């Protein structure tokens, strides 16, 4: 074998080995590239999924805050309506003496007090403007077996009476102011039931 043949053979083997190395290198580069692309795609998909989850959480949080705010505003409006109702009742009670139904109301308050205090001497105290009405009512009520006396002691009230059993000084205050306070809780519950019906 000649030197030239040996050199050619070495050259061919070297070139074959270079081609093999380059082919392996190309495969490795392709695999590395494919692996890198897969990692990038996985990272992208993961980030998109995280972003969508964050968006859903933000939307849910905002919806929750909006619901809470809406309920708060509705509650405030209803509470304001309730306040207005009580203001109107209070205004009505301040002018009750001028109403056509007041004589019946005053007599009903005297009768209720007399029935609760029982058959004994009872002093009836009224506002000075109500003395004539009270005297007429007392006259009618005494015909039913009661012993009511119109007291000289005046009371300052928008309407109604204070009755006192003389024997033991037990007092029933049926003035509109005290009755309003007594009935206020009951009225709040009733009005709330109407205004807040169906609220959770």
From Swiss-Prot:
GO biological process: proton motive force-driven plasma membrane ATP synthesis
One GO CC term, this protein: plasma membrane
GO molecular function: ATP binding; proton-transporting ATP synthase activity, rotational mechanism; proton-transporting ATPase activity, rotational mechanism
Location within or outside the cell: Cell membrane
Record bears the keyword Cell membrane: yes
Alphabetically ordered keywords of this record: ATP synthesis, Cell membrane, Hydrogen ion transport, Ion transport, Membrane, Transport
Pfam families referenced in this protein's UniProt entry, alphabetically: vATP-synt_E
Family affiliation: Belongs to the V-ATPase E subunit family.
Role description: Component of the A-type ATP synthase that produces ATP from ADP in the presence of a proton gradient across the membrane.
Subunit organization: Has multiple subunits with at least A(3), B(3), C, D, E, F, H, I and proteolipid K(x).
Name of the protein: A-type ATP synthase subunit E 3
Originating organism: Methanospirillum hungatei JF-1 (strain ATCC 27890 / DSM 864 / NBRC 100397 / JF-1)
């Amino acid at each position: 074998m000649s030197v030239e043949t040996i050199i050619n053979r070495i050259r061919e083997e070297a070139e074959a080995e270079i081609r093999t190395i380059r082919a392996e290198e190309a495969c490795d580069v392709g695999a590395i590239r494919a692996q890198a692309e897969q990692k990038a795609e996985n990272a992208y998909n993961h980030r998109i999924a995280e972003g969508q989850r964050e968006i859903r959480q933000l939307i849910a949080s905002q919806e929750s805050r909006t619901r809470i705010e809406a309920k708060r505003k509705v509650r405030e409006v209803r509470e304001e309506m309730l306040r207005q109702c009580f203001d109107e009742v209070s205004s009505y009670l301040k002018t009750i003496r001028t109403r056509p139904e007041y004589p019946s109301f005053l007599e009903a308050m005297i009768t209720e007090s007399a029935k609760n205090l029982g058959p004994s001497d009872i002093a009836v105290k009224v506002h000075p403007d109500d003395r004539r009405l009270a005297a007429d009512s007392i006259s009618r009520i005494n015909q039913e077996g009661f012993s009511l006396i119109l007291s000289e002691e005046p009371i300052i009230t928008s309407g109604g009476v204070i009755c006192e059993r003389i024997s033991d000084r037990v007092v029933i205050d049926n003035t509109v102011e005290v009755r309003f306070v007594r009935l206020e809780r009951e009225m709040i519950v009733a009005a709330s039931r109407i205004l807040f019906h169906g609220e959770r």
